[in-house]
Curated annotation (Swiss-Prot):
MF-aspect GO terms: 5'-flap endonuclease activity
Modification(s) after translation: Phosphorylated in response to DNA damage.
Quaternary state and interactors: Forms a heterodimer with slx1.
Chain spans, region Disordered: 1-183, 261-364, 409-439, 468-551, 586-734, 749-768
Protein name (database record): Structure-specific endonuclease subunit slx4
GO biological process annotation, one example: DNA replication
UniProt function note: Regulatory subunit of the slx1-slx4 structure-specific endonuclease that resolves DNA secondary structures generated during DNA repair and recombination. Has endonuclease activity towards branched DNA substrates, introducing single-strand cuts in duplex DNA close to junctions with ss-DNA.
Length: 828
């Protein structure tokens, strides 16, 4: 038995010694920590990692594991069989055993006591040394077993079960060692974990509470509670349950919070932003009502009705502000509910007020949703109306529209009476030209302005502004003999030489100073009488066949007109045809243009200061269409000579009033259409282009007038074809500047007239603005773009072939008061 025991002990002896345990003198506690000298027989620290742990025998005695207890029992049984062999003990321990007698009945009790106490290994007491000597054999027998259980993979059976547990335990011991006391380590570690789980110390929930400790969900519920008080008790219980973790009383705390929130709002910030105690004193009274509800039972009967009312009112809130501030104003909602109860009675009265028109004024101060008609009436009574300038200007005098309509109706009534009293007005040619504005010209403007009876309403605005003009039309009928006399005189002088004719027309111009409307009628009759002679005298030149020309000839013709040769032959031919037509029309109508340039200083200043001639826009419409290109050059020049001689000493202030009727002799149909649009603009737009005479400076008008009266006085006595064709070439060079200014004005207006439908459409934001609209809106006009538009498209609308430069356009803009600028050059 002893031999076999020795073999067993020797075979396991290399495994028993700890591999990484250093020599005892190397880690002497006296040398390392400066401790008091200890007994030599004490066991040294097992490893460097255990230096910072309290010294213990836990490396050789496993702590708190039932599997290790079973192993110790096995080792005790083995140690009891091997106690007789002293040599084996000396070989196992590496040092001789003590001389004290060994008691075999004590080792089990001492070993149990050591496992329970786990006393420190570094002590200065003699008890520990004696205890070690007494239990030396038991420890020496237990150490191989424990070491085998840690290594546990060489000779002992059950390797699978014993391989995992000691290694896990060794790691667990190192983790528990620095944080827990050694005496109660296993029990306290397990008990603390159980207590944490039982008490509910959950760090994740604590972190969320730390980050968001204000109960936001309860705040939302409390806001809902303020509107409807019926379910407040249930919600207060839930609020107390939520705060049970914080140790609050579930019944008392929500009541106090609720009372405070009624006075000042749920939070301090809301009270500052939304509630002002001086403006809304109602919540305090509602708190007093709530206290009365708790004290008395009689008021409890009225509370259900009061609770139902806010729910009815809440559906009628239409704004976000009303929804938010509803819970702060309790009494105002009750007052508004009283109004709501009266609204069904007020509705039939509102319907009656549509017939009567006065019954609804008593209900205006109440908070009732009004019909659109009633809302419009209430807007009239407001002191402050915020809107655009046009709305505010209209609000200054509410009776302006009524007075305007009354004045329009009176003017229509007076006009119908005059028309019925003088039926010959529509029959006579002279009177029809002046009164044609009242009779209508058959265009879109006249068709659109009709009243209920179908009669024309063209003079709604014009007659209101120029109301004294009716006296000017009456003078035509009061003095018909003078008009007939002048007309007969001019008809008789159509065959006489131009000198006599000029003198007669000078007399006619002198009579026109007393009779403002007569010159337009006499000139129209004079032109009418000479249409046949002008047609016979005026030849129509033939257009050359540009299709037969070569490319070189076409380019030469284009250069003569001032254009560069184009690559496309077809486009070049079309361009030359347009240029030829425009040039011939200008040459045949140059005399008429000269008369137009001279007549701005013409006899319509003669009417009295308050009277504007009625034939202003209508004579243009009637006469220019009938006599577009049939005007004779000699007769027109003689009339301009006579008129200029009679009118030269006249008052220069007449230039502002005499421009529009002088366009009678302007022949081109395009210009007639433009002037027709100008009439509509003068009627509607206060900011429109004034007439050319108003735009040009006084010095330019006088210089231009005197410059062109000189060549017209050198006309021969007998008009013939040569004079009519050769004379227009002479005044053309000095007349380049001024006609171009007028042509630019015509081109700008012609563009707006070319798109009347698009200008009246609702989708104005998708349409590109015309130059006229930009000028009216005071937009800065870029000179480069405006010049290119005039040269490519604009001047072509008025049959003008000449081109303009940016400097000339700038002078035109400055003379018209148009805002213009050059494009800024990009820095390279």
């Amino acid at each position: 038995m002893s031999a076999t025991a020795e073999v067993l002990v020797i075979s396991s002896s290399p495994e028993r010694n700890p591999v990484h345990t250093p020599a005892p003198p190397a880690y002497d506690p006296e040398r390392l920590f400066g401790l008091s000298p200890v007994d030599v027989e004490t066991t040294p620290l097992p490893s460097p990692s255990d230096l910072f742990c309290p010294p213990t025998h836990s490396r050789f005695f496993e702590v708190g594991n039932q599997v290790d207890e079973l192993r110790r029992d096995e080792t005790r049984k083995k140690s009891s069989t091997l106690t007789n062999d002293d040599s084996a003990v000396t070989t196992l321990e590496g040092e001789p055993a003590t001389d004290k007698p060994k008691r075999r009945g004590r080792p089990k009790k001492e070993q149990k006591r050591a496992t329970e106490e786990l006393g420190p290994c570094v002590t200065g007491n003699e008890k520990t040394t004696t205890k070690k000597t007494i239990t030396g054999t038991s420890k020496k027998r237990a150490q191989p077993a424990t070491k085998r259980s840690k290594q546990a993979n060489k000779t002992i059976s059950g390797r699978v079960a014993k391989a995992g547990t000691p290694q896990v335990k060794e790691a667990g011991e190192k983790a528990i060692c620095p944080s827990t006391p050694t005496t109660a380590l296993p029990l306290k570690a397990t008990n603390d974990v159980l207590e944490w789980e039982r008490d509910g110390l959950q760090l994740e929930q604590a972190m969320t509470r730390r980050l968001d400790w204000t109960p936001t969900v309860n705040k939302v519920k409390e806001v809902v509670e303020l509107e409807g008080k019926s379910g407040s008790d249930d919600n207060t219980r839930g609020f107390g349950n939520l705060l049970s973790e914080y140790g609050f009383n579930g019944a008392a705390a929500p009541v106090n919070d609720f009372m405070a929130s009624v006075e000042g709002g749920p939070t301090k910030r809301r009270r500052i932003e939304l509630v002002d105690p001086g403006v809304y004193p109602a919540p305090r009274q509602s708190v007093a009502d709530d206290s009365e509800k708790d004290n008395t039972e009689g008021t409890r009967k009225s509370t259900p009705a009061a609770r139902k009312k806010p729910t009815k009112r809440a559906n009628k809130f239409t704004t976000l502000t009303a929804r938010v501030t509803a819970k702060y104003i309790n009494e105002s909602t009750e007052g508004s509910d009283v109004v709501d109860e009266e609204t069904p009675k007020a509705k039939p009265k509102v319907s009656r007020s549509k017939k009567k028109g006065q019954a609804s004024k008593s209900y205006e101060p109440e908070f009732v949703v009004l019909s659109p008609e009633e809302a419009a009436k209430s807007l009239d009574d407001q002191e402050l109306v915020f809107g655009t300038c046009s709305q505010l200007e209209r609000e200054d005098s509410p009776t302006t529209i009524r007075e305007l309509q009354a004045a329009i109706s009176e003017s229509e009534r007076s006009m119908t009476l005059e028309a019925s009293g003088r039926p010959h007005r529509t029959q006579s040619k002279g009177s029809s030209s002046t009164v044609s504005r009242f009779n209508g010209s058959g265009n879109l403007w006249s068709v659109a302005s009709r009243d209920v009876d179908g009669s024309l309403m063209q003079v709604e605005v014009v007659d209101l502004v120029n109301s004294p003009d009716r006296s000017g039309t009456i003078t035509l009928d009061e003095r018909p003999s003078n008009a007939k006399r002048v007309a007969e005189a001019e008809c008789n002088t159509s065959d006489i030489n131009p000198t006599q004719k000029g003198s007669d027309q000078a007399k006619a111009a002198s009579t026109s100073e007393t009779q403002p409307v007569v010159p337009s009628t006499t000139q129209s009759k004079n032109k009418k009488a000479e249409n046949t002679t002008s047609i016979a005298r005026k030849p129509d030149p033939k257009m050359p066949q540009y299709d037969n020309f070569t490319d070189a000839q076409l380019s030469k013709q284009a250069a003569s007109f001032g254009f560069k040769p184009l690559k496309n032959r077809k486009k070049m031919i079309e361009l030359l045809e347009k240029c030829w037509k425009a040039k011939n029309s200008i040459s045949s109508e140059a005399n008429n243009e000269n008369t137009d340039q001279e007549t701005p200083a013409e006899p319509e200043s003669a009417p009295e200061p308050g009277n504007k001639p009625k034939g202003k826009g209508t004579t243009r419409k009637t006469t220019t269409k009938a006599k577009a290109k049939t005007q004779p050059s000699t007769s027109s020049k003689s009339t301009t000579e006579a008129i200029s001689t009679t009118k030269s000493p006249s008052n220069p202030n007449s230039n502002t009033t005499t421009s529009t009727s002088t366009s009678i002799s302007k022949p081109t149909p395009s210009y007639a259409n433009v002037e027709e649009i100008e009439d509509s603009e003068e009627d509607s737009d206060p900011i429109s282009f004034p007439s050319p005479s108003r735009l040009l400076p006084q010095t330019l008008q006088t210089n231009h007038k005197h410059a062109h009266t000189l060549p017209t006085s050198n006309l021969p006595s007998s008009p013939n074809r040569t004079t009519s064709t050769s004379v227009p070439k002479e005044p053309e060079p000095p007349a380049i500047l001024l006609p171009l200014t007028e042509q630019i004005t015509k081109a700008v207006r012609a563009q707006s007239a070319a798109h009347p439908a698009s200008s009246n459409s609702n989708k104005t934001h998708t349409r590109k603005q015309t130059w006229h609209e930009k000028i009216l809106m005071y937009d800065p006009i870029p000179l480069e773009e405006f010049t290119t538009w005039l040269n490519t498209e604009g001047l072509g609308l008025v049959n003008e072939d000449r081109e303009v430069g940016a400097g000339f356009v700038r002078r035109w803009c400055e003379s018209k008061g148009v805002v213009c600028c050059y494009r800024p050059r990009k820095k390279e």
